Amino acid sequence: MLPELLSFVVREGVLERSRALSVFGVDELCEALHRELGYDFFRGNRRRMLRLLIDLLVERGWLEPTRSGDRWSCRRDGIPLPGESPAGATEGDGQVDFFRRCLRLVPGYLRGEEAPIAFDAENVRVWEEFLGCDEFQACRSVLLDRMASTSGASASLLDLCYGPGWGIERAMDRWPEARITAIDFTDVFAANAKCRAERGHARNAVRGRPSSPVEWFGPSDWKGFGYPLPFPEGAFEAVLFSCGDPYIRPDARDAVYADLRRVLAPDGTLGILTRGYPDPEHRHVPSHWLRVTALIHDFTESVCAGWHGFPDVGENQAMFSRLGFRGAWNPGGAMNIMDSALWILKKR
C-alpha cells in the first residue's frame, strides 16, 4: 500500500505544491491545495488527513521538519526509491483490499464529496472482509488469551460494537464458558454476527464444551458513543472492544471509557484492539513499518463516515489512569504492547 499512497501524492500534485512552497506550515499547504486542486479543508476530517500525509512523508524522508517541528521543507522530487514504486495490483487480504478501496475514493472526498463508506447495508461485505482480515483475527486471539489469563475462563464478556461477529466467534473459541453479551449501534451486521455465533455454538458442542447463548442488544437499546450503555454497574467481568476506538469523538473519549469502567466489575478487564498514532519521539510506536502502516490506515479509513482517527498514545495512557484503570499486560503494569495496538486494562 505504501507505493500506491506515495503515487497518489505525486499524481494528485500534493508533492509538487509542497516543493513550490519551499518551507511551509499546515495553513500554507491547505491554502495552496484548496486554491490549486480544489481540496475542501473546511469540513470534517480533511484537514487532519493532510497532517497524516505530512507525517507519512516525514517518516519516509520525503519531507524534513524544521527545528520548530511545525513547518516542513520538501526533500524529494517524487522519483520513487526501491520499494516505493507501484508494482501493479497484487492480491491482498481483506485489510489491503479495504485500504485500496478507500484510497480510490480519497480524491473525491478531499474535494468535498460526502463520506462514501458507512456502517450501512450497502457496505456490509466491505466491513465483513476488512474486520475479518488475518491481522485483526490474530490480534483478537492474542488479546482474548491474555484477557482470559487475567479474568478467568468463566467470565461474563461484553463485546462492544460486535460488527460482523468476528470477535464473538473468537471469544466463543477462546472462552467457551463465557457468558457473552453483544451490543452495537447498528443492526446491519446482526444476521452475519448471529450466524457466526451459531457456528461457534456448534463447534463447541462437537468438542463437548459448554457454550451459553449470546445475548444481543442493538440500536433500540444503545444509540452509540456518547450514550450510556444499557447495563447496570459492574455487570461484566470483561469487555472486548476491537477496531471501534477511532470512531469515538475526541470530546467524548473520557465519557465513553468512564462508562465502560462503570459496567466492569471490580478488577474487571478491558481489552482494546486499535492502533496508536506514531509519536515524534518513537517511544510508543517505535517500529518504522508499524508507524507507516498506522499512518496509511488512518489516512485511508478517513473516508469512512464517523472516523476520527487513532489517538495519541500518551494522551490515552493519561486518560485511562485518570479514569481509574491500570495496565495488566505484565507484572510491571504495561497498558499496551505491539506498538500500542493491543491494550489490556484493569479496573482499579
Residue ranges and their predicted role:
Residues 226-239:
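A short acidic, Gly/Pro-enriched loop at the edge of an enzyme's catalytic core
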